[in-house]
Amino acid sequence: LNYGEDWSSRLKNARKLSKNELKDLSLEYGNFIGHKLVLFLKGKEKPDLISSHGHTVFHQPEQGITLQIGDLNQIASVSGITTVGDFRSFDVSKGGQGAPLVPIGDEMLFSEYDYCVNLGGISNYSRVVNGERKAKDIAPCNIVSNLLSIKLGAEFDENGEFGRNGKIQKDLLNKLSQWPYYLSGKSLGIENLEDSFIPILDIYSCVVEDKLRTYYEHISQVIGSHLAGKTNKALFTGGGVKNSFLMNCIQKYSDCNIIIPADEVIEFKEAIIFGLLGYLRINNKINVLSSVTGASSDSSSGSIVYA
């Protein structure tokens, strides 16, 4: 789905809106999603349910706050299909981080891999430790490289070519490596990046290509440090997998057997798993694991709007 410049801008700037303006945007966005789904489903078999993550505006679990907009009532009303969403709030109310949510899918659908790594806006992974699924956000990923690429006139760094042509700035690399988040063990949101990570890159004086090259080296070191074992298999998915230069950098810092699956899995693994979350919720089965979120217990999380 191509949002176009208008919706991309409105969602990006949603954090700046007042409470009432945010409510209005959520209603309008839900209506937009509903109509897009109707168009998408023309000529196709009607699904049993819609599972919607929504657009995250705020995620501050330490303060008990997580907000994803895209009104579920609007989606269900316009589409005529039962809709499930708001998967994070209940976990946060139980003292959890409300993230990550994907590990339940890793456990049920991709358990043959020792690590399941996602290179999305933020990189994260899950694995089994002593019989229990564990997961965490690792480091920034595409959010930051996309922002740097925009300064070079592109929406993203295709195949990592901008970074490939840059040089590592050792002082900048050291500054990025000292980012305090890495000691916190908490989930990572755009707020953390805007407040303290992106400014490190912004104030450093060098060409953008050098910033990208240094950034790739940095996140490769951090990601690689989490993946060990020559006999272990690490499944990589998410948009960052298509950045061949970044993948080569990561391989330098990990001795794991890195597995890159078919394009359908790379692009749609999270969508598939969110469909699973909705299925589990509507059947009142556990869909959020406290072992990865830190909540007081596992839960069947999410709001349901029956059409």
For every predicted segment, state its role.
Residues 1, 131-220, 283-284, 293-307:
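Conserved ATP-utilizing enzyme core subdomain
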Residues 1-13, 78-80, 84-109, 115-182:
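Glycine-rich phosphate-binding loop plus the immediately following alpha-helix
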Residues 18-72:
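Short beta-strand-loop/turn "lid" adjacent to the catalytic site in phosphate-handling enzymes
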Residues 33-40, 208-232, 281:
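Phosphate/ATP-binding catalytic cores across multiple sugar-kinase/actin-like superfamilies
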Residues 47-48, 114, 232-234:
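Conserved acidic residues
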Residues 57, 232-251:
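Glycine-rich phosphate-binding loops at beta-strand->alpha-helix junctions
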Residues 63-74, 106-109, 129-133, 249-256:
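A glycine- and small-aliphatic-rich helix-loop capping segment at beta-alpha/alpha-beta transitions
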Residues 251-273:
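Conserved phosphate-binding/catalytic loops in two-lobed NTP-binding clefts
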